[in-house]
């Protein structure tokens, strides 16, 4: 049997670099489903790097048949409380935004209704970074071949991994600087405490000596 580029051979072990890319590739995808009881609120949090495209799709299955005026609100915010996406009476839809800084983002679903209403089923699919890009659309616009599209995807993925390592290195340096600063402060505080104890002990010696002299217990 032959393939596009010649005879097909038995697949060998993947190079470690490619295997590393394949293992890290799905890490930017969040797919989850859960049940949301009436008059409850559930939130999901995720840390995302700066300047990344975030896309998502959600679907909320209403099993109440419209009873009890059941409404579900969706809101996405950053750590500062800025609203990036909001939808009242959400049932099904998509959202997209670009992060401005490395931050913790929160996706919240809140259900409101009255009476005994079955739990809603919430399905959420979030992607960011390489996985959020529509490479089919890129291929159409730039007229790329399938192999070129895959190479573009691997290039973006490797760049994303390099950026992750650079960020982790930066965080490590910041934590090391913080640790060194803390150690220096602890050292200074220890020296200050030692001088305070020495001063207090000296004062006690002179005070007791004066007291004993006043009582004529010592000369």
Swiss-Prot record:
InterPro entries noted in UniProt: Emp24-like, GOLD_dom
Signal peptide: 1-31
Entry membrane topology: Single-pass type I membrane protein
Phenotype seen when the gene is deleted: Early embryonic lethal. Decreases the protein but not the mRNA level of Tmed3 and Tmed9. Heterozygous Tmed10 +/- mice are viable but show structural deficits in the Golgi morphology, such as the formation of dilated saccules. Conditional knockout mice show a increase in serum interleukin-1 beta (IL1B) and inflammation levels.
Cited SMART domains: EMP24_GP25L (SM01190)
Transmembrane segment boundaries: 186-206
PROSITE patterns named in the record: GOLD (PS50866)
Domain notes: The GOLD domain is required for proper p24 heterooligomeric complex formation and efficient transport of GPI-anchored proteins.
Name this protein carries in UniProt: Transmembrane emp24 domain-containing protein 10
